[in-house]
A protein has these predicted regions:
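Short, small-residue-biased leader/transition segments that mark boundaries at the very start
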Residues: 1-4, 8-15
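Glycoside hydrolase catalytic-domain context in secreted enzymes
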Residues: 11-228
């Protein structure tokens, strides 16, 4: 939806029936919806693993943050994924500024996940750390609960080196296991969604609904001489 904040907010709010309210599902999540990529993740594509996006406070508040705010406050998404790039000098997957907005300002209670291999980018592409252990420290210290990639395999090494406060690990574990409990993964198939048979997957009525959604979601703009 480009940079149109209203379209962004409208589309992301549609995930509200997956959120934490639990009003008609016994308190269980149907799925753990994730909002991504936080934040100012708009390219350039070829440079996204090392790019530093500069956005002033006005642009952040009016353009880049409203959709995420709607996801957190209205849709109550369970997860937020950090972007590959830096925003105003801070890597998005370990940004104190973005975490302050997300948790302190908006009240986000779910877990934060890195984009795939984004934490490896800290030392390989952004060059803001020198080693995987330093990257792990930076990410955990700044609220990245789970790493899509393999860099968190260095957590134990970082602990042995005295680089990591184990309280950071405990905090992340609480968030991650909270999501699993909300999904009913420890409740022995007692959630309302366990009764849905596998035959519902790609059944005719669902395929038709997906086709209808795609067909009716297309917008064709008429050229009234604006373009050559």
């Amino acid at each position: 939806y480009g940079d149109h904040r209203d379209l962004h907010s409208f589309s992301t709010r549609r995930s509200s029936d997956l959120g934490r309210d639990g009003s008609d599902n016994g308190g269980y999540l149907r799925a753990a919806a994730c909002a991504k990529h936080f934040a100012v993740h708009s390219g350039p594509e070829a440079l996204r693993h090392s790019f530093d996006a500069q956005a002033d406070p006005k642009d952040m508040e009016e353009t880049y943050l409203p959709a995420f705010e709607a996801c957190v406050k209205e849709a109550k998404v369970e997860a937020v994924m950090g972007a590959y790039n830096r925003t105003n000098g801070e890597v998005c997957c370990a940004s104190p500024s973005l975490q302050k907005i997300l948790r302190a300002k908006w009240g986000f209670e779910g877990h934060f996940v890195s984009d795939c291999w984004a934490i490896r980018d800290f030392h390989e592409n952004h060059k803001i750390t020198a080693t995987p252990e330093e990257s792990v420290k930076l990410a955990l210290e700044n609220g990245c609960d789970i790493n899509c990639g393999c860099t968190y395999q260095k957590i134990l090494d970082a602990v042995k080196l005295g680089m990591i406060d184990e309280a950071w690990i405990n905090e992340s574990c609480v968030r991650l296991f909270t999501t699993r409990y909300l999904l009913g993964l420890f409740d022995d198939e007692k959630t309302p969604y366990d009764a849905i048979p596998f035959t519902e997957v790609e059944c005719e009525k669902n395929l038709e609904l997906a086709h209808r959604a795609a067909r009716e979601g297309i917008v064709l703009l008429k050229n009234d001489g604006v373009l050559p």
